[in-house]
């Protein structure tokens, strides 16, 4: 019988009154001062044989609402104070990135299809009505075609969107994808592209606009450097080398994802080179890959610092933000935490809580199968003497996160949590370079299944964007066009 182990905390959000943590399909709220666990909620998948594990989450700035999504393609909104599920909406494709607008009233979702949709926090009543069971074939086709009557299409990429950020005035949205692109578009008129930040050689997986420098963008992904941009002009200001700092701390190696070869007789038709939840994939682990997962500018007293980590890496990295914007002298530092970092959250008192994975030796691609000697799932860090160091004292909240919030499962099933999925999903192979669905894919007349359906759906997205653009241009021709107000 397989032994059970305590699963790690995938996401942590620390608010002034309540802290939220996500583990598998369970959500916990804790009192941020006492650490007492106040509420527990469990997500159940609406479909058979579909995982109920929560993959992504986001909270509003006021810490009133939590938004989550997972493999079941449901967008759930929760009330933080009692973890009541306020709404549950079906979305066309699995969500990849979730963000909330500054006022907390709009949810922005980037999906595996390469599009960003916006949804109102409180859905219209019609959205909550049960779906009719009649004509289920048409419904399935509509979902596959990426029809989304409940969401507003903002923009679309020809590749999976890996991250996006709204600028500090929410006048623009900056989006990145698996095909090395960083695009600056007007928001919410996302079809109106203002600028490109070009230069990455590999996928881009993390973006950050520092609050201390709102006209600058920092991006990272699979390249051995972080890129610093003047995003309004697309100018690359600097590149900060990071790979030599990260490589010694890699605990989980990545791999490449390829379409699974069909069993039995070989098909005469070439299998579609489309990476999605509609194609069976196999993974090959054992290669070192860099995937920058999160970038965040933090202020410690009077010092601005950029924190970041990489998937499968056991250290938290940081550098001081240069006031002079001279990045030539930037020194990248690291703090070894022994176990791979999963997430970090900034606490109001200037401390940082870091979630780590003590179960990593059980995951595919682990560099060692020897169990970790440190079972702590959360560490608290502080800024001291010009460095990020571990806090010598352990708060009641950290104690509760480490000892409570107990979610156990078989040791051989930690891979189902998807903690290291980007290490396998983002790198490309020569045979799979078009893995996200190229725009020039021919569209056959029969679009009821297979690659034709995917290509037709992408073409439909493009047509929808063009239609919106044409309507807007027509409207501006009938009225005096007002100049756009640039952000300062």
Can you name each region flagged by the protein language model?
Residues 135-139, 143, 235-488:
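Terminal intrinsically disordered, low-complexity extensions flanking WD-repeat/beta-propeller proteins
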Residues 2-27, 52-56, 305-307:
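Beta-strand-rich domains and repeat architectures in extracellular enzymes and scaffolds
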Residues 16-17, 62-64, 103-105, 169-171, ...:
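Short coil/turn segments that connect the beta-strands within blades of beta-propeller domains
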Residues 3-4, 42-48, 88-91, 153-156, ...:
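Surface loop/turn motifs at the tips and blade-to-blade linkers of beta-strand repeat domains
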Residues 6-12, 48-58, 93-100, 155-166, ...:
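Canonical WD40 repeat/beta-propeller blade segments in eukaryotic WD-repeat proteins
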Residues 30-39, 77-87, 113-151, 169, ...:
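Per-blade loop-tip surfaces of WD-repeat and WD-like beta-propellers in eukaryotic adaptors/scaffolds
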Residues 23, 69-72, 110-113, 121, ...:
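Conserved strand-to-loop turn within each blade of WD40 beta-propeller repeats
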Residues 20, 67-68, 108, 174, ...:
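Structural core positions within WD40/WD-like beta-propeller blades
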